[in-house]
């Protein structure tokens, strides 16, 4: 941190030095904004953590979605400074969209960190903390989170370190009780991992370093050095040469839930793209161009008809897709789907549509594998719909019914994209 402090001071950005630990590019440090998903690793006495620092600015929401798709817990950092919270939460601000996107990505636990409580406009006032909590709670609830069991609220000052690692003392904050941020994270229940299932690892990054390196979160299964896997949708057989943890240490095994870097052979790095999936050769994930999905239309100024195009974000993939047909709509009162196809869809409606991608995409039915079956549609810088895959369609019009999760996988997370 001394190095970051010295470099930030030389660049005239002395007060930004803490952010330089994750904002590593010249562009990010010059603008004071996170652009790419920064990665860091740390340990407490109880657990090992991988931090995915996702951008907050609306221009970089696609990068934020990629980060959320790899997370188990979302830490929503809110500024308590007067005016900053209001700007982020008002219509057009990013706080609302980020809450909805992390839910769509399958994150089930949210820690809302109210930062900058030491700011002169706040002065660690309990009323400001309560005001922000009261305003955010209804919206977090409407996004699908249980605010009593799935959401935790922590006031902190990241700059001074108060209530981050150690609990705030009464001398620092007279009204605050309860655990610090790191203490809270250490007590969040761990997610059941599908370590006995087939290997599924969506690729978030790739680069060349004595071979082809791929980075991602192992969603299912286990990997060891020497394993033969298949890169989808290319269907290229590869071999695992080495496995590295987030601490850059070479390890012998990786299990479901681990964020890892793999050195593989059998494919060049230029033939791998974010959104590809490393899978078991015996049970590769599906790769299709056409599928059916249930969509909830969120925010679109015009009606949506067959032929509408948008960018689909699913796990670590961003791909242009087209709604080739609208098949059914759901009656708001009865919840039943229509027999006749709708002519159009508009904000607030739920529909079933047939979707066609411009290229092969690695997806699964939501019912079989939620992490590869939930997605968002974005257009003109806005999230216009959230959806879940209900059917995979082969080129010959047949419905693909068997997914990777039809073999024993253990527990599967159960959350909806509604």
Where are the language model's segments positioned?
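Conserved Switch II/interswitch segment of TRAFAC-class P-loop GTPases
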Residues: 47-50, 54-60, 69-130
């Amino acid at each position: 941190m001394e190095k970051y402090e010295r470099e930030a001071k030389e660049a005239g950005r002395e007060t930004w030095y803490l952010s330089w630990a994750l904002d590593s590019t010249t562009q990010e440090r010059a603008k004071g904004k996170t652009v790419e998903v920064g990665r860091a690793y740390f340990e407490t006495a109880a657990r090992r953590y991988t931090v995915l620092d996702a951008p907050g600015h609306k221009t970089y929401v696609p990068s934020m979605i990629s980060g959320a798709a790899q997370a188990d817990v979302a830490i929503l950092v809110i500024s308590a400074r007067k005016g900053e919270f209001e700007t982020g939460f008002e219509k057009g601000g990013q706080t609302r969209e980020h809450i909805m996107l992390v839910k769509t990505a399958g994150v089930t636990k949210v820690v809302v960190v109210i930062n900058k409580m030491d700011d002169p406009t706040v002065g660690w006032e309990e009323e400001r903390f309560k005001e922000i909590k009261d305003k955010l709670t209804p919206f977090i609830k409407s996004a699908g989170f249980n605010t009593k069991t799935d959401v935790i609220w922590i006031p902190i000052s990241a700059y001074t370190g108060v209530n981050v690692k150690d609990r705030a003392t009464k001398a620092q904050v007279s009204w605050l009780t309860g655990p610090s941020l790191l203490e809270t994270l250490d007590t969040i229940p761990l997610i059941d991992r599908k370590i006995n299932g087939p290997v599924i690892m969506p690729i978030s990054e790739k680069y060349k370093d004595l071979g082809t390196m791929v980075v991602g979160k192992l969603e299912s299964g286990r990997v060891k050095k020497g394993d033969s896997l298949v890169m989808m949708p290319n269907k290229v057989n590869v071999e695992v040469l080495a496995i590295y943890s987030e601490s850059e240490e070479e390890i012998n095994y990786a299990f479901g839930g681990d964020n890892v870097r793999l050195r593989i052979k059998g494919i060049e790095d230029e033939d791998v793209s974010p959104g590809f999936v490393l899978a078991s050769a015996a049970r590769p994930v599906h790769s299709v161009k056409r599928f059916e999905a249930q969509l909830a239309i969120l925010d679109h100024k015009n009606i949506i008809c067959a032929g509408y195009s948008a960018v689909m974000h699913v796990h670590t993939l961003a791909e242009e897709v087209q709604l080739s047909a609208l098949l059914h709509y759901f009656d708001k009162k009865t919840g039943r789907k229509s027999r006749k196809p709708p002519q159009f869809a508009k904000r607030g409606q739920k529909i079933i549509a047939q979707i066609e991608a411009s290229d092969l995409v690695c997806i699964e039915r939501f019912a079989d594998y939620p992490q590869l079956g939930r997605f968002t549609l974005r257009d003109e810088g806005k999230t216009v719909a959230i959806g879940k895959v209900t059917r995979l369609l082969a080129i010959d019009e047949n419905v693909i019914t068997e997914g990777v999760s039809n073999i024993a996988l253990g527990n599967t997370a159960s959350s909806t994209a509604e």
